[in-house]
């Protein structure tokens, strides 16, 4: 710090430095003025702390290599969920950023980004949902999980991303996937999974959804029934990432589908 001799002045609170003022030829005094402290940064939320613990930082070249390698592996074996997850993280940033902007433009979406809710057996009381009326969204979600013997705890953690908020958007996409299955009325077999992927592809723009939809279809009536329905739903359904699903558990399923503009697939 540099000190300089000046004439006595009235000191404000806008600076924090030591000023030496002249009292006499042989005497001086030093006055310290404290500036207001900057507000401390808020501590990271629980999701950000977890993400930073698991994050694997990669260079742009490594990201390209991971993207190409995971896409080839997913093409060879569409059931390699780890490769599909890696593909989404390494290629999905532009789409995730668009989803974030879309969420910020919606009251419900902004609330999701602020709260950062999680969907797993530690955060959702499955027994309470099961006790809801049979026509409720929450009850039918638990029925879907039990019928297909799956758990919301099986979703892969996001590792290869830089932005914690975009990492949350990706996590949210993964954790609501089974909720989308439920509200669309789609099973977890190949046809159901492919149909849901098409809806998600058109609804979110995530590139790995297009990949799963294109390369996963292996059954004949896919082109006849499932694909036309999925394409129509993908275009007409309201943005699914803007739905605060946890506040809809008690809502009647038929009412929720009508609100989201979802039509069930009917095969005669």
Curated annotation (Swiss-Prot):
It comes from the Eukaryota. Its main location: mitochondrion. Its EC number is 4.1.1.130. Lyase that catalyzes the C1-decarboxylation of 4-hydroxy-3-methoxy-5-(all-trans-polyprenyl)benzoic acid into 2-methoxy-6-(all-trans-polyprenyl)phenol during ubiquinone biosynthesis. Pathway: Cofactor biosynthesis; ubiquinone biosynthesis. Residues 1-10 have a biased composition (Basic residues). Pfam families: Coq4. Residues 20-38 have a biased composition (Low complexity). The keyword Isomerase does not apply. Its cofactor is Zn(2+). Zn(2+) binds at residues 177-178, 181, 193. This is Ubiquinone biosynthesis protein COQ4 homolog 1, mitochondrial. It comes from Culex quinquefasciatus.
């Amino acid at each position: 710090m540099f000190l300089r001799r000046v004439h006595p002045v009235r000191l404000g609170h806008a600076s924090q430095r030591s000023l030496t003022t002249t009292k006499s030829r042989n005497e001086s005094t030093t006055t310290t003025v404290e500036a207001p402290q900057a507000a401390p940064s808020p501590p990271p939320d629980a999701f950000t702390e977890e993400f930073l613990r698991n994050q694997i930082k990669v260079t742009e070249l490594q990201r390209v290599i991971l993207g190409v390698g995971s896409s080839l592996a997913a093409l060879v074996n569409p059931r390699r969920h780890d490769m599909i997850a890696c593909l989404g993280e390494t290629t999905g940033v532009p789409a995730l950023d668009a989803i974030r902007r879309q969420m910020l433009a919606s009251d419900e979406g902004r609330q999701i980004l602020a709260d950062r809710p999680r969907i797993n057996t530690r955060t959702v009381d499955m027994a309470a949902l099961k006790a809801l009326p049979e026509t409720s969204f929450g009850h039918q979600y638990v029925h879907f999980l039990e019928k297909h013997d799956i758990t919301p705890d099986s979703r892969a953690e996001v590792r290869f991303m830089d932005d914690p908020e975009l990492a949350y958007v990706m996590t949210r996409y993964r954790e609501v996937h089974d909720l989308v299955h439920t509200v669309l009325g789609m099973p977890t077999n190949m046809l159901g999974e492919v149909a849901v992927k098409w809806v998600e592809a058109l609804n979110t723009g995530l590139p790995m959804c297009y990949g799963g939809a294109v390369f996963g279809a292996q059954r004949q009536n896919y082109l006849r029934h499932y694909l036309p329905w999925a394409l129509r739903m993908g275009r007409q359904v309201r943005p699914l990432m803007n739905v605060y699903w946890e506040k809809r558990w008690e809502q009647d399923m038929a009412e929720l589908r009508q609100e989201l503009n979802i039509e069930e697939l009917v095969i005669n």
